Amino acid sequence: MSDQLPDASAQPPDPAQAEPFDPKPVIARLPGLPGVYRYIDSAGNVLYVGKARNLKKRVSSYFNKTQLSPRIAMMVAKIARIDTTVVRTEAEALLLENNLIKALAPRYNILFRDDKSYPFLKLTGHRFPRMAYYRGATDRKHQYFGPFPSAYAVRESMQILQKVFQLRTCEDTVFNNRTRPCLLHQIHRCTGPCVGAISEADYARDVGNAASFLQGRETEVLEGLQSKMEEHAMQLEFEQAAAVRDQIAALSTVLKRQAVEEVGQARDIDVLAVAVEGGRACVNLAMVRGGRHLGDKAYFPAHADEAAMIVEDGDEGAEGGETEPAPAVPLGVERIAARVLSAFMVQHYLDQAPPPIIVVSHVPDDAALLEALALHAGRKIALVRQPQGQRKAWLEMAQQGAALALARRLSEQGSQEARTRALAETIGIDLEDLALLRVECFDISHTAGEATQASCVVFHHHDMQNGEYRRYNIQDITPGDDYAAMRQVLTRRYQKLVELMQEQGGLDPAGEASSPMPHVVLIDGGKGQVEVARQVFEELGLDIGLLVGVAKGEGRKVGLETLVFADGRPSLELGQGSAALMLVAQIRDEAHRFAITGMRARRAKARTTSRLEEIEGVGARRRQKLLTRFGGLRGVMAASIDELASVDGISRGLAEEIYRQLH
């Protein structure tokens, strides 16, 4: 339940005529209820999103200028509008705040970059279940185990299960069409259900044992295997008994290498450790599933130091916000760590279901956090601050991992900032804040003109922003014409930005409040490609000084590249030791990698499905039935007319047409 308050300043003022913002009329209308507030500048950009138990007290605390830190006073000075939403409880406010932070990415909030969903290990619902790596939404048709912190952790578990339980990993289309066992069967990594080498009952027993192992019931699995081995021995089935004995030995070896949670305790645990240094923070998340430590993953928030101080300056006090805010003082490392941990838990666990127990290095400072997580998960969540035994060891490992990851990031950040500065100086860009430097790079990829694809990658805030990468399928050009491909992608990319800038009143493309127009546009190519880019920019009315070509050196050797400028400046050879060239090469190589992977995927898709798609009368369902029945396009091409006609939904006439089209 929410209520958008009326606001006299609901429309962003004209920057040229804006008067100093007067918060008093807005604050006077605010209720003393839970809710979310948003500070917005004169250009309509959201500066900060916060929640409050008492909107009136929280918002008014920011405008007591004698008690604000300099950085927060700078943010308050930019406020031109305040929007608020009233909710029923502080827990609801926390949920709404999280959604808005993720959607709007405000400059002064603690932000964790959205990560793609965590991977799972899947056992399919097939009568001979397949073991597979999986990422995406889950359903009830299959069994899912995880989530795992990384793809490596999933594949490591799959290797263990292959070695111990020998479950199949092949696709169903391959499984349904095999006549001989594959290499995995020969090296004892699969029991060969595809050729009847194991009964359905025995395979189901192996699947059940694998599931029990993943759920942490190792003792139960070992006892069951021991009983099975003795049963085979009693019946003089010594070969089968030896096979089970090998399973027991392999499983025992695995268990000796892993730290396993004590029997009888909760088996699914997350361990969170925070490290803070030099205004940067790292949250290290270690996952324990089924009592087994699956690995960890480091997260680095943006704006941690500034955002923590904003929350402190706007703190409502202990009970319902009755106390006045204390004078601004620098926050200690422990307090910043608690703020960062709260932000991480909200942003992470409202997307990923939390386990029943979370071990933490610091106590989160948000009283509504546990209530919101329990509301979201539908059960209670326990926080453990001072763990004992194995959990204590896991927390110490996570703390050490957080410290090491942060030290590595700070070191990399220093060298990356130096490269950014060198590039800005080389090209002649004057920015007070080098983190704002935005570089976009384009590359064209194809194979002999087939499946031409262009890529655009983005460098911003001293790092590659893979969430902003884009691929463009190039069409209606002469195959292999890289110039036409470059013209098409640049036109498609920047024509939209020009239209957006015109809607915003013709703002300077390099201005802070404008659309995301880059400061530098890198073109992977020499004078010819740069000339095409120059023509496109002139047609669109854009500054050709933004364009820089990266021409390969003699023999295409790395370090001998030349920068080619579209505005008439002489070409520039930077030399192998140039920090600017290192950054240019990094961005250019990433554009090439992104383009070539997309091109290969597109080409593979075209080669495997396009010929069937072109046959009239063969829709998606019939195509899938054909591919499933014959194990792929090659099997369809090898099938006779009678075999094609035997597929459900394929008439004799359609079978003849398919055969004719494929031969």
Curated annotation (Swiss-Prot):
- The UniProt regions of compositional bias labelled Low complexity, in chain numbering, are 1-20
- Extract the SMART domains matched here: GIYc
Question: InterPro entries in the record, alphabetically?
Answer: GIY-YIG_endonuc, GIY-YIG_endonuc_sf, GIY-YIG_UvrC_Cho, RuvA_2-like, UVR_dom, UVR_dom_sf, UvrABC_protein_C, UvrC
Q: Name one GO biological process term.
A: SOS response
| Region Disordered: start-end pairs | 1-24
Task: Name a GO CC annotation attached to this entry.
Answer: cytoplasm
| Similarity comment | Belongs to the UvrC family.
Name of protein: UvrABC system protein C
Write down the species: Cupriavidus pinatubonensis (strain JMP 134 / LMG 1197)
